[in-house]
Amino acid sequence: MAPSEKDIEEVSVPGVLAPRDDVRVLKTRIAKLLGTSPDTFPGSQPVSFSKKHLQALKEKNYFVCEKSDGIRCLLYMTEHPRYENRPSVYLFDRKMNFYHVEKIFYPVENDKSGKKYHVDTLLDGELVLDIYPGGKKQLRYLVFDCLACDGIVYMSRLLDKRLGIFAKSIQKPLDEYTKTHMRETAIFPFLTSLKKMELGHGILKLFNEVIPRLRHGNDGLIFTCTETPYVSGTDQSLLKWKPKEMNTIDFMLKLEFAQPEEGDIDYSAMPEFQLGVWEGRNMYSFFAFMYVDEKEWEKLKSFNVPLSERIVECYLDDENRWRFLRFRDDKRDANHISTVKSVLQSIEDGVSKEDLLKEMPIIREAYYNRKKPSVTKRKLDETSNDDAPAIKKVAKESEKEI
């Protein structure tokens, strides 16, 4: 059975692409703030869930949330690169495309004047498009992590501390501002809220209550370890679970048309659809062919856009054929060969929904055994959980319409 073909193109990043000189300044600021490379996307990347990760859920504490079908973006609050004392908000994707978002404001906690603004604040989240009965659409930015706030980097802190900082310093002031400035916030290009999370053993609630009520696409679950720091790049403790039929790979598509002995190439005839995997730098290697039937070929041609040398997301059908799902123009490169191997391993060694639910009582018992009072646990609470209560309060508020 094919996954739901919700076109990612339906969700577009709001704002205007920043000029090259501004982007250079923004990249430098972020790199200096985080201690990372200016040309590397600083966001974390999950690994595919396999059977071995069931043990990880038993040994460590995790939060779990639904995996939204949207556009992954980091949100950066700063001062405009060229104008002093002008607050600016930018969204940037994995390609390091920076979009200047206007007509949005994130107030500072306890600022009655409304003149203060956040600088060097970096959030991790995803843009999703909620569709309501009657056709109303609402763009949302769902936050699932906080890398830095007002120049202080929190990547080395634990997840509940990072989320607590977002809840206390950003979400709470925003909610209060919204109540008193309804006219101004009504024109915000998107709503901002904390992504709803459950304890690692709470997936039954996600499957039965949360996911069925979503107004945007979903293609799995994300398990985030609460005991580890935020990692730029691949994070082995950040787990991406998908049903087998939703395990997809992003390839580089290349069309190879038959070369006639005489005359011109017939570009309307069906070509070979070659799928390439990324080997690093600018190197790609052939991986497999993509199966396309006549009906699908006609649909692809009807797009009337170049098809070759584009990133395509593919799934493996019941006959082990790679099939087209959608274009991934939000990505600069196809999946790296290491990621491809990980996804294939996940498909081969996959964990079904039933497998997850079967293990949940054991994972839950292990979690509460770890919660038994100990000196170590109390010290950990004192150093990292001081903002945890704010998470629950704001998470509850974030479920309401802003």
UniProtKB/Swiss-Prot annotation:
One Gene Ontology term from the biological process aspect of the record: 7-methylguanosine mRNA capping
Q: Which residues form the active site?
A: K67 (n6-gmp-lysine intermediate)
**EC number of the protein:** 2.7.7.50
Claim: Nucleotide-binding is one of the keywords in the record:
yes
Disordered: region residues: 374-402
Q: Which domain of life is it from?
A: Eukaryota
UniProt KW keywords? GTP-binding, mRNA capping, mRNA processing, Nucleotide-binding, Nucleotidyltransferase, Nucleus, Transferase
Where is this protein chiefly located? nucleus
Transferase keyword on record: yes
Any one GO CC term of the record: nucleus
Task: Cite the Gene3D superfamilies for this sequence.
Answer: DNA ligase/mRNA capping enzyme, Nucleic acid-binding proteins
Where does this protein reside within or beyond the cell? Nucleus
Catalytic activity as recorded in UniProt: a 5'-end diphospho-ribonucleoside in mRNA + GTP + H(+) = a 5'-end (5'-triphosphoguanosine)-ribonucleoside in mRNA + diphosphate
**Family in the record:** Belongs to the eukaryotic GTase family.
What does the UniProt record say this protein does? Second step of mRNA capping. Transfer of the GMP moiety of GTP to the 5'-end of RNA via an enzyme-GMP covalent reaction intermediate.
Complex and partners: Heterodimer. The mRNA-capping enzyme is composed of two separate chains alpha and beta, respectively a mRNA guanylyltransferase and an mRNA 5'-triphosphate monophosphatase.
The name this protein carries in UniProt is mRNA-capping enzyme subunit alpha
Which lineage?
A: Eukaryota, Fungi, Dikarya, Ascomycota, Taphrinomycotina
